[in-house]
Amino acid sequence: MATRIASMRFRCALFQSALTLGRNEVNIKRYVRRRRAVSGVVSVNEPTEISEGVISQTSERSSQHNNDITRNTDKSSIENPVSPNNSQPVQFSHINRQKVINLTSRTRFGEVDGLLYEKLHPGDKSLAKLARIAGSKKLREHQVVLEGKHLVCSALDAGAEAQTLYFSSVDALRELPLDKLRQTNVVKVKMEDAQVWSELDTSQEIIAIFKRPEASRLTFSEEKYGRAVPLTLICDTVRDPGNLGSVLRSAAAAGCHSVLLTKGCVDIWELKVLRAAMGAHFRLPIIPNLTWTDISNHLPKTSTVHVADNHSTTMGKHNDNTTPQKHRRPSDYGWVKGHQYQSKAHDDDDANDLCSLEDYCDENSKSLETQLYYTDWVAGHTSLIIGGETHGLSREALQLAERTSGRRLLIPMVDGVDSLNSAIAAGVLLFEGRKQLLSLEKIRV
């Protein structure tokens, strides 16, 4: 009996030892499982102290591993992941959940022929800056918006600096010189997002923001556009955007040497001017906001300056045998508007100190010969002044023509027609001037 009791005690001790060892092994396994790092996730069933420790560790590491998170990860699988150690769904902490959501909602990237581009998600408001730049004259002092493949290609070929380019079609992007867009932020958008700000009936597939170009920094290819003729166009207070754009387009088509614009002309980078000019801004030098002193300095000393007379009210009936009246003063022509000029600088001057353009011209102007536009009037470098339809030619324009022995070029019209549109008159005279210059064989085509 005693032997039997001793045997039972021995077996019980062994069982107790084995039981204790098994419990320790289970505790070790549980301890190891609890200490196991789960990247970015915490189980719901784990103790609060350990959860806080893991969250603090992953929070410290999240800033270092943001770049390792795959941008194409499915958002649903991130929001409701499953722990490998727990069949129940696990949860992110509030901070880490927001970080991951921000990463997955970021702009994704793509590539076209080695050119990286961003792909904006729908509803992105970055396109709103296009409307702000296009509608603000102050912002256009530094940036301009160009719309359409033709205009953007012309700007890039001339050396203009593109800052941001938006496109809605990969095929349209491939038509651009991609090698000139390596330093440009290229963004893919949906067509409907671009249509929100565009004023065109048919939205373009390419829209770009450029640093405002300067004529001195652009290059104009003679191989592509041909050699320019020695003919300079001067725009005197042309304020209609459509007219100015058409004038610039005619000047580019006629191969003019340059275009000079006085202060008071409409902004050449306004959208309506850009659309009407059809890329003329990047085919020849266009220099805006000049005083008449600046204009004189931009012209060769031997240049002869003529003015366009697109009105016929003072000439009566015209035919091929009509000889224009000569040696008339500028004030004799009704199309020269009655601008007023103040002879003194103070506001309290007597009203008699104000004189109209007509009075000024009667007293001070020399005679300005008038001739039909199709008779010879070019010799060497020639300049032509076109006035705006509202205000006509200024006093300074007439004085410059008189100083250089220029003439008034008359475009005859049938009775009952008062005048020609400024853009039409410019086109007629510029192409006539080109024809005469080429006929002199002073340049080669």
Curated annotation (Swiss-Prot):
Biased composition (Polar residues): 54-70, 78-90, 311-324
Keywords: Methyltransferase, Mitochondrion, rRNA processing, S-adenosyl-L-methionine, Transferase, Transit peptide
Disordered: annotated segments: 52-90, 311-334
Catalytic activity annotation: a uridine in rRNA + S-adenosyl-L-methionine = a 2'-O-methyluridine in rRNA + S-adenosyl-L-homocysteine + H(+)
Chain residues that bind S-adenosyl-L-methionine: 387, 411, 420
One GO cellular component, as annotated: mitochondrion
Main location: mitochondrion
Protein name (record): rRNA methyltransferase 3B, mitochondrial
Organism: Danio rerio (Zebrafish)
